[in-house]
């Protein structure tokens, strides 16, 4: 599942030969029309289904049922891989949303992500100055101009706490900056 694919910028990184089907959960109507175009232009028709919904369970679960992915037996462990790229910074309830997404992973499934995070100024690679700048940017309207993006989330920690993991790979990038990132994956226990 591709969570918050926007216009489909990540589709070029998916391997059409190994993917059976991708379900893209995109809540923005403005992005959906562009996503449909990208899917067509990249040759993903028949292998990429756009779901007009958000990542939150109350929106996502009905969309997955409509696709026939969640059956009457209630089993929600349906995805081999869930990809989140710069989207978890914008969901209203990140901890609950991530927990809901993790429940959709099959045992051994991967939760892959690339996300903005809070500057970890208390670590050796963090920066108190950058953390102060980050805080000021947030105070002076970052969220309202950047589609709800919250730069002050500890997203990797939220993912860590959302499930039982048997393996993980994390890389922190530009830790010293006011807009640091973390990317990597967690493999669900099982």
Question: Where would I find each of the regions flagged by the language model?
Answer:
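Short conserved AdoMet
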Residues: 15-19, 92, 106
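A short SAM/SAH-binding and catalytic strip from SAM-dependent methyltransferases
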Residues: 77-93
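A short glycine-rich, Lys/Arg-flanked "PGG" loop and its adjoining helix->strand segment in the class I
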Residues: 95-107
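Class I SAM-dependent methyltransferase SAM/SAH-binding core
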Residues: 1-66
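C-terminal alpha-helical "lid/dimerization" subdomain adjacent to the S-adenosyl-L-methionine
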Residues: 114-183
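A short acidic, Gly/Pro-enriched loop at the edge of an enzyme's catalytic core
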Residues: 60-82
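C-terminal lobe and adjacent flexible extensions of AdoMet/dcAdoMet transferase-like proteins
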Residues: 182-190
